[in-house]
Amino acid sequence: MHLATMLLFLPLIHSPIAAAYLGGFDYNATHFIRGLNDGGFLNSLFWWVTFTGSITFMVLITIALYLAGARKEALVLALVFIITNAVAFGLKYAIARPRPSDLGIPPEAQPAFPSGHTANAFAFATTLSSYHRKFSIVMFSLALLVAFSRSYLGFHYVTDLIGGALVGITISIIVTQAAKSVDGEVTLIANTSPPPTTWQGVVKLPLVFITQLLRVAYALIKRRK
């Protein structure tokens, strides 16, 4: 599925016809999941789970992978996250679906569709699984838990989660396939700078990362021409 096709498809979820078919299911499924939350231990646990779909966590995990030596994966992941969040936020404000305010979310909060946390979680799972298939079950299980947590905590309707998953998976597939088509060049870029051995090297590391990220992005754009 091409990105343009996905962007055209997602708003259809909120068309009048789709609303007639999905409205009851969406409301009932969301309230059922929310009703499972009794405010106890699981509520606290799912707050931690939902954090793993946040932009903050994704930045931290990307940095950790880069420092651990998985530079190629970290650079591709960074591109995936940037595009995923740009598309997710664009769709949020284009569709402007209200949050489920009856579940305790203030009406002035950021629009609901699609779920950005879910998009990030599935983008992460799809990207890492494409490079390390043995972790696929674990990665997608975690992504599903993040998605579930968003309705469990009352932040999203179920269709927001479906939309977020589609955004994350689709963009990840597009970017990772493009990166693998120029894998040699991406690998070379990722290895242009040796790991820092001094404080000066550590200080320069963010600039090195940004430079490499821009070079990888250019390599993918050049490949598309």
Model region roles, listed by residue range:
Residues 1-57, 89-107, 192-194, 211-225:
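N-terminal transmembrane-helix/juxtamembrane module of multi-pass inner/ER membrane proteins
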Residues 58-69, 123-126, 137:
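Hydrophobic, aromatic-rich transmembrane alpha-helices
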Residues 41, 70-74, 132-138:
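Membrane-helix interface segments
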Residues 101-222:
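Membrane-embedded catalytic cores of phosphoryl/pyrophosphoryl-handling enzymes
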Residues 3, 77, 81-89, 165, ...:
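Alpha-helical transmembrane spans of integral membrane proteins, capturing the lipid-embedded, hydrophobic core
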Residues 67-69, 94-95, 178-182:
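Helix-loop junctions at the membrane-solvent interface of multi-pass transporters
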Residues 9-14, 84-89, 143-155:
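Aromatic-anchored segments of alpha-helical transmembrane domains
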Residues 62-86:
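Interfacial segments of alpha-helical transmembrane regions
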